[in-house]
């Protein structure tokens, strides 16, 4: 039996990454759909003050509108020297949603006088799974590192070109996709949802109490 799962995102690069992570997870019986595969519906605005709140709002709307189990994520960059910002505002930090170059340049400008020892940061991802019947689960993944002064690399998206993960010399944008998926905030969050996804598919390996039970 195949279970259809909706990944509720309009970001094509994020959708590719989510699909890639799920494909490598070994959960059989999932047909992964994107928003382009279902009728259009009004999507929740990202107005919650937390990553978890935004992820849940998007997944709830998607599950209610389509009748499908839905996974949504909200993620962003948390910069120590900026008091945790841009945080949930990461995608629109420079004012326009999804302008990766402007967002990245603004963060670098704000950190111009910050020394290397204080350029710590983390990528954070909240991933939410919501079933049409109303059951839901939300998990967090975090990826710590530091910010360099100039972008490097052509892979990834968002702030990847300025983020060097702990234990690495390369930026996230210099990692191969499979390398990034194995350690990234989004990879960690989705892997934390695997017991619930296995339960949705009726597969062994679901934890007691995982969705749907």
Question: Where are the regions a protein language model picked out?
Answer:
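Anionic-ligand binding patches
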Residues: 2-6, 12-213
């Amino acid at each position: 039996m195949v279970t259809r799962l909706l990944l509720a995102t309009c970001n094509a690069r994020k959708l590719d990454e989510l699909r890639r992570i799920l494909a490598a997870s070994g959960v059989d019986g999932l047909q992964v759909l994107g928003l382009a595969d279902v009728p259009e519906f009004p999507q929740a605005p990202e107005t919650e003050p937390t990553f978890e709140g935004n992820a849940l709002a998007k997944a709830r709307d998607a599950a209610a509108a389509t009748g499908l189990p839905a996974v949504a994520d909200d993620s962003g960059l948390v910069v120590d020297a900026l008091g945790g910002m841009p945080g949930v505002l990461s995608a629109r930090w420079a004012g326009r949603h999804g302008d990766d170059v402007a967002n990245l340049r603004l963060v670098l400008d704000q950190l111009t006088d910050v020394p290397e020892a204080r350029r710590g940061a983390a990528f954070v991802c909240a991933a939410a799974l919501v079933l049409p019947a109303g059951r839901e689960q939300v998990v967090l993944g975090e990826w710590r590192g530091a910010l360099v002064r100039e972008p490097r690399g052509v892979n990834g998206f968002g702030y990847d070109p300025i983020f060097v993960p702990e234990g690495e010399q390369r930026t996230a944008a210099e990692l191969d996709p499979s390398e990034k998926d194995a350690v990234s905030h989004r990879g960690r969050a989705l892997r934390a949802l695997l017991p619930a996804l296995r339960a949705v598919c009726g597969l062994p390996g679901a934890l007691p109490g995982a969705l749907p039970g």
